[in-house]
A protein has these predicted regions:
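Bacterial Sec-dependent N-terminal signal peptides
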Residues: 1-21
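Short, conserved micro-motifs composed of acidic
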Residues: 19-313
């Protein structure tokens, strides 16, 4: 009897782990591609935008897949991308503006790359084409780099920057949309930003929680882990909590939450390749383990995510 009780607990533990461990997202769709990162799902859940990055991070293109009757379409590079390094797409609340970061020049006739700015494209509806890219301009963009836009339902924009006024290295900033103009960006409170690196934040549409990556010695893997913070009654952010069930020894970043379907997506370069194999590897073995996922290539992962569970911690 004791044996069966122990066995029952083991089965429950295994099932519990299998339900909470991050899983590769659409591995067949991204098979054969180099690094895949970033994800933006349209508000109507019918489009998925992501970044295809080369191994040296020299060129990056934003691509999309669209929902069809029998699944999803094949990836297609969007109309406004393919010449420079375009990364980190993010939708507005109505799905008719797409923000992204790019090192493209301000002069459309130039081929000289610059620092990373936040750009955007517009459309009338999900069936209409995107406009030409427009630079978001000051006060958000500077002569330094601006990364990873995330937009609230009222149009405020959160992004990453190392500009003057940071609390450490890279910080997460917010700029409020007031009277159709953006306010001077402010570094988030100490619950989020520290003397370390904080970057690539997803903020919920209602701004009640934020998920971001930080590199903090003595916490997590130290290579970049996901943290969550909640907006408190005093409008400041609570002390960030490490998302331990998601963390790996690799860089985990670029979070996105599908609020409607309670799912968290993120990018990771985690690997299942071992540093020792008892059986000597053959050439075919090497090809197999290098092509199986996860193999250290940047890929998208997903995990069930119920925000109330984290509020209890």
């Amino acid at each position: 009897m004791k044996f069966y009780i122990i066995l029952l607990f083991m089965i429950i533990a295994i099932l519990s782990f299998s339900q909470t461990a991050p899983k590769l997202f659409m591995p067949k769709v991204f098979e054969g591609l180099p690094n895949i990162r970033d994800i933006a799902i349209s508000p109507n859940n019918e489009e998925i935008y992501f970044t295809i990055d080369d191994y040296k991070y020299k060129i990056g293109v934003i691509a999309c897949i669209q929902k069809q009757k029998n699944g999803w379409s094949k990836p297609k590079v969007v109309s406004f991308s393919g010449n420079f390094r375009d990364i980190e797409p993010a939708f507005s609340s109505d799905g008719n503006i797409l923000y992204f970061s790019s090192n493209r020049p301000l002069d459309k006739d130039s081929t000289t790359i610059k620092d990373y700015d936040i750009w955007y494209v517009e459309r009338n509806n999900s069936k209409s084409p995107w406009s030409s890219p427009k630079n978001l301009g000051k006060p958000i963009n500077t002569t330094g780099d601006e990364f990873y836009p995330s937009i609230t339902e009222n149009g405020d924009i959160y992004f990453t920057s190392s500009r003057e006024g940071t609390k450490g290295k890279e910080d997460i900033f917010v700029s409020r949309l007031k009277n159709n103009a953006y306010t001077k960006p402010e570094s988030l409170s100490e619950g989020v930003n520290t003397a370390n690196y904080e970057f690539n934040a997803y903020v919920s549409p209602k701004e009640d929680f934020i998920i971001f990556t930080s590199i903090r010695k003595g916490e997590g893997s130290g290579r970049g882990d996901l943290y969550i913070s909640f907006k408190e009654k005093n409008k400041k952010w609570s002390k960030a909590i490490l998302l331990e069930t998601i963390s790996s020894s690799a860089l985990d970043y670029c979070p996105f939450v599908d609020i409607k379907n309670n799912k968290l997506y993120f990018t990771s370069s985690r690997s299942a390749i071992k540093n020792y194999y008892s059986k000597r590897l053959s050439y075919s073995d090497i090809l197999r383990i290098y092509n199986e996922e996860p193999s250290g290539k940047s890929r998208l992962y997903t995990i069930p995510f119920v925000i109330e569970n984290f509020k209890k911690q």
